[in-house]
């Protein structure tokens, strides 16, 4: 038993050590400042730096150690502040802003100053670029996840979303919007604009599917459909409203109520269906089951 506990402890220690090493900031160039205790100031056109899979460029970078520690002693606890035309790249993600404050201790880089980001599809000939803007963006170097807060706007082809918070998983191409989220699918041809609201929106950006839950409301032309949750497939032009589903047409005064309603968004038609199970497992965030 002691051996098992010891092995588990060693494994945990190894994971922590690897995580700490992955968070170490590397800045290129010859800095100004106290080389032993810092802070060190780097300037260039631009300054280049890396941390884990993140590549950073900026007009200036300042690296500091906690008070009372040398830069060498503080490796894994230092901070780096990048200012002026900050550019961050990681795989298919590119983010921009005026300032990025990075902490080796947390592995978080916080981007501010009108931050924005784009995430290009793996197959550019068969997909749309995801664009994000917010008041602040936090990039996690331990995994390919970013968190945006404050007047968040996300666009993905003809879909656009607004919320107060967005978590975007680059590996899963999965977005979670909370804080009064609203999703809009732009009108196209005879297809009228569709607006979906609820307490939480999850979107698979490559597949163009949505899972919205918590007092959902779909508005399209004169049709308003409400329920507990909705699954929407943009490519198939169909939405399934599940749980206490009610659809009302303000023009014809018709009303349809059922446990499950299917709404064809291309022809604005609603009908009852006997069964439909939302594939919620497709929208699980990291660590969720």
Language-model region placement:
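N-terminal amphipathic/hydrophobic interface segments
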Residues: 17-289
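Hydrophobic h-region of N-terminal signal peptides that target proteins for export
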Residues: 8-17
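Sec-dependent signal peptide recognition
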Residues: 2-7
């Amino acid at each position: 038993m002691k051996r098992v506990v010891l092995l588990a402890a060693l494994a945990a220690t190894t994971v922590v050590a690897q995580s700490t090493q992955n968070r170490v900031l590397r800045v290129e160039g010859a800095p100004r400042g106290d080389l032993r205790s810092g802070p060190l100031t780097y300037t260039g056109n631009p300054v280049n730096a890396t941390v884990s899979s993140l590549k950073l460029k900026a007009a200036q970078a300042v690296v500091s150690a906690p008070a009372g520690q040398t830069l060498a002693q503080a490796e894994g606890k230092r901070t780096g502040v990048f200012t002026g035309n900050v550019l961050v790249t990681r795989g298919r993600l590119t983010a921009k802003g005026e300032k990025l404050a990075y902490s080796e201790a947390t592995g978080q880089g916080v981007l501010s100053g009108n931050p924005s980001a784009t995430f290009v599809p793996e197959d550019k000939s068969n997909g749309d670029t995801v664009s994000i803007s917010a008041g602040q963006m936090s990039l996690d170097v331990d995994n390919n996840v970013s968190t945006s807060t404050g007047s968040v706007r996300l666009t993905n082809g003809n879909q656009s979303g607004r919320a107060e918070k967005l978590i975007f998983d680059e590996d899963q191409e999965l977005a979670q919007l909370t804080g009064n989220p609203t999703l809009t699918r732009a009108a196209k041809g005879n297809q009228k604009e569709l607006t979906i609201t609820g307490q939480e929106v999850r979107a698979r950006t490559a597949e163009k599917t949505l899972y919205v839950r918590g007092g959902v409301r779909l508005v399209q032309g004169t049709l308003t459909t409400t329920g507990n949750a909705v699954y929407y497939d943009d490519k198939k032009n169909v939405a399934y409203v599940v749980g206490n589903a009610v659809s009302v047409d303000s023009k014809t005064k018709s009303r349809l109520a059922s446990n499950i309603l299917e709404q064809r968004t291309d022809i604005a038609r609603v009908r009852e269906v006997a069964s439909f199970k939302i594939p919620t497992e497709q929208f699980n965030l990291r660590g969720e089951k």
